[in-house]
Amino acid sequence: MMQLPERVEGLHHITVATGSAQGDVDLLVKTLGQRLVKKTMFYDGARPVYHLYFGNELGEPGTLYTTFPVRQAGYTGKRGAGQISAVSYNAPVGTLSWWQEHLIKRAVTVSEVRERFGQKYLSFEHPDCGVGFEIIEQDTDGQFEPWDSPYVPKEVALRGFHSWTATLNRNEEMDSFMRNAWNLKPQGRDGNYQRYAFGNGGAAKVLDVYIDEDERPGTWALGEGQVHHAAFEVADLDVQAALKFDVEGLGYTDFSDRKHRGYFESIYVRTPGGVLFEASVTLGFTHDESPEKLGSEVKVAPQLEGVKDELLRTMNDPIVI
């Protein structure tokens, strides 16, 4: 199969269906030290829910964890194969003992220190909805500047994504897609894990695949406790269009049209492994809020400004930071 030009640059954002907005703030902001950079709404369905964006100071690609807290809307699903099963953050070398103690103090059940691909890490789950997380020790050179959080000292702060892990029943077809269509390069194996990287790897440029032949498939619909999609960065709309054209030419035709998401432009493709991938062009978060005010107000489409308060009352999912 023909290999395409290297158009995909790295991890952009991850989008997760969670339980409650406050549960997300308690974990992402008050425990992991991320900034709530944007509060918007998701309107598909009978009841609106928040769409929350967490990251570093300006929400750079490679730091963005976005959530749909869907519990009150009644969206349910099942975790399993064909989904992203863990989101891993970078932490400075030598800080895992601090993070382990900190997570325990915050009533988060956390693993002992483990090792994979020669790197030490901790694993834990979102206390409110069960989504998987990891914190991986890595040299801070070339990593993202962390948000100056009042909850986490800067010297131990998380510095964007290290990697994401997809759980699959088998990897043959997904391996071909990632190498030939998504320009990921195999980096080796560690047990049931296969590592891939964009370019030479580094911060937010790694994707792991965990093979579990016995894991039952997860659901694809938006449901609490599941990663909905994994978004990857492309440079601009022309590159995005060329990527779609060429990937469809390889036979991967389950692509969406371009979607304007307010803060990025997106196209989506269902991969052979079942994971929903997005190719995302960054527009940024400061066109409707100043850098100092990011995340301070709920932003809605202009045509909905007149009913925003009513939507918030209907949602009934308060946030206290």
UniProtKB/Swiss-Prot annotation:
Its cofactor is Fe(2+). GO terms for molecular function: dioxygenase activity; metal ion binding. Pathway: Xenobiotic degradation; gamma-hexachlorocyclohexane degradation. Binds 1 Fe(2+) ion. PROSITE patterns: VOC. Belongs to the extradiol ring-cleavage dioxygenase family. This is Chlorohydroquinone/hydroquinone 1,2-dioxygenase. It comes from Sphingobium indicum (strain DSM 16413 / CCM 7287 / MTCC 6362 / UT26 / NBRC 101211 / UT26S) (Sphingobium japonicum). The gene is linE.
